[in-house]
């Protein structure tokens, strides 16, 4: 049995309860999420529908003109399967208006801009519906820094941030995510033909095995190499995790007082509750 195997029924109950507790305790009843047509957002959509009722979940597909038409088709498929409220908001006019001033911008800049435009749409709809924005980044992406700061990494709550990609696949089977979404190659769909694993240079299953030992089991480099991982791979992943730490925390605040936010003023739960 793989170390990454999870009790999907138990984790399902935990995450449904998490969404209910965190959303209801602030007086909200609804949730908003971006539905890309990929497996991560599909899983969050199904969990939110189960936790809040599909009528209280607003899923928004936000295509750009180069987006694969299959992505929107799969987003619709997930919305139909989960029964949530679904809408499409194109981001082409907003993105192109900006890059008309910077026509030589590379794919990375354009992809980050798209992610941040989608973030603004989601938080605007959060205000419209009075719901919290749900994050859809998994643990693998968060550890590698494979996401856009204040873009797809921005949310009020993230129910799948402690699930490796391998575990996202497992739980998606449990909750009933449509097969075409589970079986397709992971892609952020930021430019034509882009796939996550080709861009990263390794498969999610390979890196998940390494990350689990490195992070969850705290294995050092010598132990990881002894377990069969190549030294170059271990060093590369360690660097990615280390260099992307700024994406996983609040902005660093210069300390000038007796109690500084995220330094001395830190609480595991809401202050005073």
Swiss-Prot record:
Q: Using the record, list the residue span of the signal peptide; answer none if the entry has no such feature.
A: none
InterPro entries for the chain: NAD/GMP_synthase (IPR022310), NAD_synthase (IPR003694), NH(3)-dep_NAD(+)_synth (IPR022926), Rossmann-like_a/b/a_fold (IPR014729)
Name of the top EC class for this enzyme:
ligase
Reaction(s) catalyzed by this protein?
A: deamido-NAD(+) + NH4(+) + ATP = AMP + diphosphate + NAD(+) + H(+)
**Annotated GO MF terms:** ATP binding; glutaminase activity; metal ion binding; NAD+ synthase (glutamine-hydrolyzing) activity; NAD+ synthase activity
The answer to whether the entry has keyword Ligase is yes
Provide GO CC annotations from the record.
cytoplasm
> Where on this chain does Mg(2+) bind?
40, 141
Q: Pathway it belongs to?
A: Cofactor biosynthesis; NAD(+) biosynthesis; NAD(+) from deamido-NAD(+) (ammonia route): step 1/1
Binding, ATP = 34-41, 136, 165, 187
Q: Which Pfam families match?
A: NAD_synthase
Residue positions binding deamido-NAD(+):
116
Q: Which NCBIfam families match?
A: nadE, PRK13980.1
* Listed HAMAP family: NadE_ammonia_dep
Name the protein family.
Belongs to the NAD synthetase family.
Name-wise, this protein is NH(3)-dependent NAD(+) synthetase
Q: What is the lineage of its organism?
A: Bacteria, Pseudomonadati, Thermodesulfobacteriota, Desulfuromonadia, Geobacterales
> What gene is this protein translated from?
nadE
